């Protein structure tokens, strides 16, 4: 827990870098956390003169095996740099949701994405039930007191003595003196009430600040569990002070909607693992992946990716300019980034009653509580609207359990036998809240969480009023081949490319007729004029495909001079009107709500750990899911693992009758891992360190989404 002076409560980032912080002592951690240490173990502050040097005394103390895996297509990386230099949030959002932002650029990209995020522009956070009840009771008390005051006799109402004297017309000097004394008494009473209220607020704020300090100290204790005593350095103290002030200011601003919870501190801590809290420095928190014997709580974020940086000429110089000299791209403070990130992670759709009220502002009558609950119940079970609109945390948890039973029945049955999800809401099952409500905060690996947050921060829907040319211009007319490398939306559904082509004005009626016939014969679900009986899930598929996908036809000459994707090539060659149905350029947009997508990502993570989970008991499972290790495997096993995946995908596509089991690209090795791509890797030369494949987890989440959608459509028929 940090010791801060009373005047630092409202201090800014600049004020937190005062002389008082530079004289940090072992007293910066309190005894009740058992983290006190003697001066002998006090850390040497990181050298400021050479901030790119690792905090550790030598590079040899950190093995290559501890470096995270990172491979990234060079063309996409250069495109990301181009969009960053021009602050192009359209292009950065596209890369973020499709491939993820390079970790070494997140500290500049995330602020740009957050500034333009729909959930920041139109924020809505689900209010805490306790605060909601307090607000309702206070309004009712205020209403009753006002009605009581209106029925009070005039002579006893505040300020009524003067009015009564004027009405009576017989007021004398004594009456005036009495009136003056009464007004003075009223003013004194109001001042006393205001002072009392201010003191209560100060006491409440002090309690919140103490909770924040205690949670920050728990983070240190969690990382340094093998050390009974630990002292923070000057730089660490400054970083933790910035975090404390950011959390406190957010709580003061949004305290009437949500009360302080430890999750707010953990969001700040996890943000500080990628975004340096101190401006113009590379220092970030290390995260739980580092050994408890690591000398410091902070690390230079460039050190983890030194192999990748050294493989690209002039990249290190470019990053140093971004860190120390940038005044144009992004200079936003940690506090502002933190507030916007919380608005995205904790966002939920407005209740039905609130949406209707905003649409009909002239109607002032409130719906009673039973009607609102009825609407929420109907929305809770409406699986055709939840994927698009999202829902409250209660609705998402119910949806998660439903999908778990449907998509991973064996694991679901084991969870049922072990009673893993039967005590939802208790401390035993709080891992699920951290997964779904707080988007992996605290419980996931920083590397997995960073990639998933990339996906959520890059979430964008297509504006139906904008055409292809508008977005293509916003992307600065990106090269077709580079755009193809980004691939389709992860949560794609059937009928997107084909429907766009069949609906194009350049295609004649015969081509449309042939196209529709082919779709029907192959099981592709397409809206036809003659259909009478239609499934609600078919409507959902068509709605997702038509509204959230945008593409434009490419002429035959352009196709001849450019490389087509496997999906569009296969589609064009299979059609009898290939001369007309030429491949198209696609700009993928988000299709499902990001928090619903997070549900399928969570299911994919559980599926990847299934073999481990079935070997554990109740307590071990909950502990494991509360500190989920990074999904990784040895680099020298990558080849065999890849072959297994390809074999499994091939068998699944040949045995499955579901058209959703087929990917928009061919499932051969060359299409999954094209040899023509220039991919720069952070891998060590000995190829023995672990490789993170969270991208595969996210891709598997898309497969689970299509599997769920297909099964629901079959049952709906």
Curated annotation (Swiss-Prot):
Q: What's any one GO cellular component for it?
A: cytoplasm
Species this protein is from? Candida albicans (strain WO-1) (Yeast)
Q: List the disulfide bonds.
A: none
Q: Which residues form the Rab-GAP TBC domain?
A: 100-460
Keyword annotations for this protein? Cytoplasm
Please give the SMART domains that the UniProt record associates with this protein.
TBC
Residue ranges of the region described as Disordered: 1-66, 132-209, 353-377, 503-522, 555-583, 636-670
InterPro entries, alphabetized: Rab-GAP-TBC_dom, Rab-GAP_TBC_sf
**Feature: compositional bias, Basic and acidic residues:** 189-209
Q: What broad class describes the main subcellular location of this protein?
A: cytoplasm
Q: Where is the composition biased (Basic residues)?
A: 636-645
Question: What is this protein identified as?
Answer: Oxidant-induced cell-cycle arrest protein 5
Q: Where is the composition biased (Low complexity)?
A: 1-25, 132-155, 504-515, 560-582, 647-658
Subcellular location(s): the record lists: Cytoplasm
Gene name as annotated: OCA5
């Amino acid at each position: 827990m940090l010791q801060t002076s009373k005047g630092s409560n409202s201090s800014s980032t600049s004020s937190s870098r005062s002389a008082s912080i530079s004289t940090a002592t072992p007293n910066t951690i309190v005894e009740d956390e058992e983290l006190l240490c003697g001066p002998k173990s006090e850390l040497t502050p990181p050298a400021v003169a050479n901030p790119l040097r690792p905090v550790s005394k030598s590079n040899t103390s950190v093995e290559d095996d501890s470096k995270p895996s990172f491979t990234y297509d060079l063309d996409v990386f250069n495109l990301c740099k181009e969009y960053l230099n021009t602050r192009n949030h359209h292009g950065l959002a596209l890369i973020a949701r499709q491939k993820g932002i390079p970790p070494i650029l997140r500290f500049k990209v995330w602020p740009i994405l957050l500034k333009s995020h729909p959930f920041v522009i139109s924020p809505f956070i689900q209010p805490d039930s306790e605060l909601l009840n307090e607000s309702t009771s206070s309004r009712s008390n205020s209403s009753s007191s006002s009605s009581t005051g209106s029925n009070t006799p005039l002579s006893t109402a505040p300020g009524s003595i003067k009015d009564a004297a004027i009405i009576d017309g017989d007021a004398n000097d004594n009456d005036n003196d009495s009136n003056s004394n009464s007004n003075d008494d009223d003013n004194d009473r109001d001042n006393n009430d205001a002072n009392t209220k201010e003191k209560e607020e100060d006491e409440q704020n002090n309690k919140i600040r103490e909770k924040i300090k205690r949670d920050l100290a728990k983070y240190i204790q969690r990382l340094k569990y093998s050390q009974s005593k630990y002292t923070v350095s000057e730089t660490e103290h400054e970083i933790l002070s910035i975090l404390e002030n950011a959390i406190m200011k957010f709580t003061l601003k949004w305290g009437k909607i949500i009360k302080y919870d430890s999750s707010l501190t953990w969001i700040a801590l996890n943000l500080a693992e990628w975004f340096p809290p101190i401006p113009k420095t590379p220092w970030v928190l290390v995260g739980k992946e580092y050994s408890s014997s690591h000398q410091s709580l902070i690390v230079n974020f460039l050190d983890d990716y030194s192999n990748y940086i050294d493989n690209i000429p002039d990249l290190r110089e470019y990053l140093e300019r971004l860190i120390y000299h940038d005044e144009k791209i992004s200079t936003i403070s940690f506090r502002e980034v933190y507030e916007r990130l919380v608005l995205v992670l904790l966002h939920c759709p407005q209740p039905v009653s609130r949406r209707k009220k905003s649409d009909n502002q002239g109607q002032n009558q409130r719906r009673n509580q039973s009607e609102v609950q009825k609407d929420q119940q109907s929305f809770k079970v409406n699986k055709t609207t939840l994927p698009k609109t999202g829902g409250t945390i209660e609705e998402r948890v119910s949806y998660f359990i439903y999908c778990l039973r449907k998509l991973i029945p064996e694991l679901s049955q084991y969870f049922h036998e072990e009673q893993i999800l039967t005590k939802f809401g208790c401390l035993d099952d709080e891992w699920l809240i951290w997964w779904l409500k707080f988007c992996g905060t605290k419980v996931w690996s920083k590397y997995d969480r960073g990639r998933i947050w990339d996906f959520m921060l890059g979430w964008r829907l297509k504006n139906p009023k904008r055409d292809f040319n508008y977005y293509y211009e916003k992307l600065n007319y990106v090269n077709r081949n580079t755009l193809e490398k980004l691939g389709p939306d992860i949560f794609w559904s059937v009928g997107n490319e084909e429907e766009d082509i069949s609906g194009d004005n350049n295609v004649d009626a015969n081509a449309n007729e042939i196209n529709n016939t082919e779709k029907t014969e192959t099981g592709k679900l397409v809206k036809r004029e003659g259909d009478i009986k239609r499934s609600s899930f078919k409507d959902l598929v068509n709605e997702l495909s038509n509204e959230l996908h945008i593409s434009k036809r490419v002429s035959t000459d352009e196709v001849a001079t450019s490389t087509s994707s496997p999906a569009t090539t296969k589609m064009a060659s299979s059609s009898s009107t290939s001369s007309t149905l030429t491949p198209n350029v696609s700009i993928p947009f988000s299709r499902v709500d990001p928090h619903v997508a997070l549900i399928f990502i969570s299911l994919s993570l559980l599926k990847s750990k299934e073999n481990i989970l079935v070997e554990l008991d109740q307590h071990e499972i909950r502990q494991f899911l509360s500190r989920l290790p990074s999904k990784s495997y040895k680099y020298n096993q990558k080849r065999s693992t890849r072959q297994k995946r390809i074999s499994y995908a091939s068998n699944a596509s040949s045995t499955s009758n579901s058209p959703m089991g087929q990917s928009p690209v061919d499932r051969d090795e060359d299409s999954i891992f094209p040899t023509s791509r220039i991919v720069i890797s952070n891998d060590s030369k000995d190829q023995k360190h672990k490789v993170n494949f969270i991208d595969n987890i996210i891709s598997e989440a898309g497969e689970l989404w299509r599997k769920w959608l297909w099964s629901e459509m079959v049952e709906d028929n």
